[in-house]
């Protein structure tokens, strides 16, 4: 969905978003009730203070002397009521914070759990920065709006109705002056809120786009600098940044008009009460103290309209962000596991029967693929870029489901076994290394958290990683920066290999496993892999054909089909597509 489309949610969609927000609040109904009760106490105390002040004023006016004793009694009452109001306001803040940040926590937890169930196709087609923006920035903005809503909306509405009752009790005509003029604030606020909402929605969307772009630029900064594309990167950022500025200015323009417009109406109300009240006071209809009460109430009555108009604007922004979070939560999950899904007990036998797959409906990638892999065989998959090698690995791991045919492991269709048991049967070394922020020891033990130090050390030695690990500042307790930023690419690859060495699952998938390791290290790693692969079904994906010469079977893929199959010597003797790939690689090395 484009940013423009996102910014045009219909009123029905906004109502649906609000309903879902209320559903998220429902588990915290106890705190909502407490908040309402405490807000009522706080408002009642605040509204009682003007009455006490009016009484004190009347006690100081008149033909006789000032009633100092009476004034002191009133002052003591004012202090007590003010303390009660302050304490109630503090409790209100505690309750509202509990509601807001609990809902925010629940939303983030739900979003992260959702990401765990999303199909790989969703993650491949959505920028990671945008997903992060929804989980972090959008939830934060939503929390700010929700907190303001709870803090000011409850007390504001209670203040409006409370002051209205007190004013009606004191003088109906003056009250009518207030009631007739004040609703103009709501008309103005409603008009501006409708126009600011779509811009806040657009702002949230463009902010997510900007986060994705910044994330991409930071991760690829070395490549950008190597190719001298700094200017192009700045231009791309300036374009997104400019759009964010434009939509933000429009959103702020309409939202910032709300406060002065409502204050203008409030000042008219205050002046009207002062004039009409003065006439009544001169005529003897009310006392000076009562006029003071009305002026205070007029201010307190109109102030919530001003605050609520600001709250409405913030809630519009909060709803816009909530809609983006709910859009993530509503994304279609990966195909659920079968109700009677089995735990896979594999013997290493893998069979593909008439497998077909496509990323796009009109563009088939793999068609009619048949393959029978015996237990313990080493299967090398080679071919030009885009022929389907990595896709085949994704299908074996069930990151994607086949569109036709079936994949069986140990005679079981992988759609009938649990994903956890299927993926736990494979050890993977991917082309793109991934390390978590933690120690070297924790990264090696990622697949086996209960591993002993002896097992971790043995795995590192088997992967030829022990020597470089010991040279690190704190050895195995060295903390690795985000995505391994403080070690080399080759060292990251060695740690990923050690991670697999520790688990030793029955099947292996090696996707360009040694593409970032120097030749000397590669020889050592190949020897370690040879020992590790003994008796284990292994799938090897590589562009460097020299790394798969020892494979039992080489599958040569082209346009989603296996065009040749055999061992290295057989395929070279055929002089076919594999021979051309092999010879062209070494011709390139020689030149």
Write out the residue ranges for each language-model feature:
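A hydrophobic transmembrane-helix motif
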Residues: 48-50, 54, 81-84, 149-193, ...
């Amino acid at each position: 969905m484009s940013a423009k489309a996102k910014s045009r949610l219909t009123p029905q969609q906004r109502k649906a978003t609000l309903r879902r927000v209320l559903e998220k609040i429902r588990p915290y109904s106890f705190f909502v009730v407490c908040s309402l009760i405490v807000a009522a106490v706080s408002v009642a105390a605040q509204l009682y203070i003007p009455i006490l002040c009016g009484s004190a004023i009347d006690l100081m006016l008149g033909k006789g002397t000032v009633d100092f004793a009476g004034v002191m009694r009133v002052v003591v009452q004012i202090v007590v009521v003010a303390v009660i109001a302050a304490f109630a306001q503090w409790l209100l803040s505690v309750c509202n914070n509990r509601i807001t940040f609990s809902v925010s926590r629940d939303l983030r937890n739900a979003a992260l759990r959702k990401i765990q169930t999303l199909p790989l196709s969703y993650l491949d087609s959505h920028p990671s920065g945008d997903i992060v923006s929804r989980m972090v920035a959008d939830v934060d903005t939503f929390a700010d709006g929700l907190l303001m809503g709870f803090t000011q909306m409850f007390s504001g509405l209670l203040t409006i109705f409370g002051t209205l009752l007190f004013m009606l009790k004191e003088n109906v005509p003056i009250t009518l002056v207030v009631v007739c003029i004040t609703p103009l604030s709501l008309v103005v606020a409603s008009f501006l809120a409708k126009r600011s909402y779509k811009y806040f929605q657009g702002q949230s969307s463009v902010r997510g786009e900007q986060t994705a772009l910044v994330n991409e630029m930071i991760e690829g900064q070395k490549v950008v600098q190597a190719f001298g594309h700094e200017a192009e990167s700045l231009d791309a950022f300036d374009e997104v940044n400019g759009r964010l500025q434009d939509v933000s200015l429009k959103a702020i323009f309409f939202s910032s008009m709300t406060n002065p417009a409502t204050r203008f109406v409030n000042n008219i109300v205050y002046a009207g009460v002062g004039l009409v009240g003065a006439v009544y006071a001169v005529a003897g209809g009310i006392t000076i103290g009562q006029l003071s009460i009305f002026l205070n109430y007029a201010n307190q009555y109109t102030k919530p309209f001003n605050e609520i108009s600001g709250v409405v604007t913030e809630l519009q922004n909060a709803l816009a962000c909530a809609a983006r979070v709910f859009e993530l939560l509503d994304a279609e999950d990966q195909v659920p596991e079968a109700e009677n899904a089995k735990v896979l007990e594999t013997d290493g036998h893998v069979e593909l029967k008439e497998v077909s797959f496509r990323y796009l409906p009109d563009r088939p990638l793999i068609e009619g693929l048949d393959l029978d892999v015996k237990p313990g065989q080493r299967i090398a998959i080679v071919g030009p870029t885009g022929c389907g090698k990595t896709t085949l690995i994704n299908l074996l791991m069930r990151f994607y489901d086949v569109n036709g045919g079936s994949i069986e492991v140990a005679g079981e269709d992988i759609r009938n076994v649990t994903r956890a048991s299927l993926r736990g049967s494979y050890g993977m070394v991917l082309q793109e290394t991934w390390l978590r922020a933690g120690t070297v020891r924790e990264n090696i033990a990622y697949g086996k958290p209960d591993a002993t130090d002896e097992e971790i050390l043995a795995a590192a030695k088997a992967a030829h990683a022990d020597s470089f690990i010991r040279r690190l500042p704190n050895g195995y307790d060295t903390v690795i920066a985000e995505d391994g930023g403080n070690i080399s690419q080759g060292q990251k690859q060695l740690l990923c290999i050690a991670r697999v060495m520790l688990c030793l699952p029955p099947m292996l998938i090696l996707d360009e496993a040694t593409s970032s390791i120097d030749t000397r290290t590669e020889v050592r790693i190949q020897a370690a892999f040879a020992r590790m692969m003994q008796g284990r079904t292994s799938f090897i994906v590589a562009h460097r054909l020299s790394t798969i010469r020892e494979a039992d079977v080489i599958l040569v893929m082209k346009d989603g089909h296996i065009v040749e199959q055999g061992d290295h010597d057989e395929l070279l003797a055929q002089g076919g597509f594999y021979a051309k790939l092999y010879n062209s690689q070494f011709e390139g090395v020689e030149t």
